[in-house]
Design a protein with these regions (language model features):
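Glycine-rich phosphate-binding loops of nucleotide-dependent enzymes
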Residues: 2-198
Length: 198
C-alpha cells in the first residue's frame, strides 16, 4: 500500500473531534484464543490513559495492533480522523507519530546514554547522515532536557549496557521522548524497577 508521506507528519494528524486514537470492534485471535474480543477504546489528544489488567488480558496485544505488529481479525484502528493503522506498516506508524516502549528495554548497550538519545533523535536514518550530521543547539537542548527528565544526567557518558535495569527502562523512555511522538504507548514501564527508580 502506498501511504501519502504528507499524512505522516505529526502536525497533519486531524484531531478536530478530540480523539487521537480510535479502536473500534477489534478482535484478535491466536489459535482460537481471543486475545481481544470486540475491543472499543477512544483516546483524546493529550489524554493520559492507563490500561490495567492481569497477564493475558490483552494489553500488549492491543499495543501490538496499534503499532502494526499484529493485524486484527476484525475492527478498525485510526490515528486521528484519517490514518487507518491497519493498512500501514510498523515503520509508517512510527513515522506518523506513535512511539512505543516494550516490556523488555531495547537500547544500544555499547553506546553511551547520550549516544542512545542522539541516535533516537535523528529523523533521517541513512548512514551518511547518522555518521556526519552534527547536532543543532536545539537538538542538544532536547537531549539535555530529556536527560534531566529521566534522571540520567550523571550517567550521560556511561555505556547503556552498564546501567541498572531501572535506568535502562528510563533510557528507553527518554529515547521515545526525544522523538516527540504525538501518541506514546508504554508497556509495563516500571516492571523490575526498585522504589527509588520509579
Amino acid at each position: 500500500m502506498n501511504i501519502d508521506e504528507s499524512k505522516l507528519k505529526d502536525d497533519s494528524i486531524d484531531t478536530k473531534h478530540g480523539c487521537i486514537l480510535y479502536i473500534e470492534n477489534v478482535t484478535v485471535s491466536f489459535d482460537g484464543f481471543k486475545a481481544l474480543n470486540d475491543l472499543n477504546l477512544y483516546i483524546d489528544d493529550g489524554e493520559l490513559r492507563c490500561i490495567i489488567g492481569p497477564n493475558g488480558a490483552g494489553k500488549t496485544t492491543m499495543m501490538d495492533v496499534v503499532t502494526g505488529k499484529t493485524r486484527p481479525d476484525e475492527g478498525t484502528v485510526y490515528f486521528g480522523q484519517s490514518l487507518d493503522l491497519t493498512q500501514m506498516t510498523e515503520y509508517e506508524i512510527a513515522h506518523a507519530g506513535i512511539g512505543r516502549k516494550f516490556q523488555k528495554p531495547t537500547v544500544f548497550k555499547n553506546h553511551t546514554v547520550y549516544e542512545n538519545l542522539e541516535l533516537a533523535l535523528h529523523t533521517n536514518k541513512d548512514i551518511w547522515t547518522s555518521l556526519f550530521k552534527k547536532l543543532s543547539p536545539e537538538q542538544k537542548d532536547t537531549i539535555e532536557d530529556t536527560l534531566s527528565a529521566i534522571g540520567l544526567i550523571e550517567q550521560r557518558f556511561v555505556r547503556a549496557g552498564l546501567l541498572a535495569h531501572g535506568q535502562t527502562q528510563w533510557l528507553e523512555i527518554g529515547m521515545l521522548l526525544v522523538q516527540d511522538p504525538r501518541l506514546l504507548l508504554i508497556d509495563e514501564p516500571v516492571a523490575g524497577m526498585t522504589h527509588q527508580e520509579t
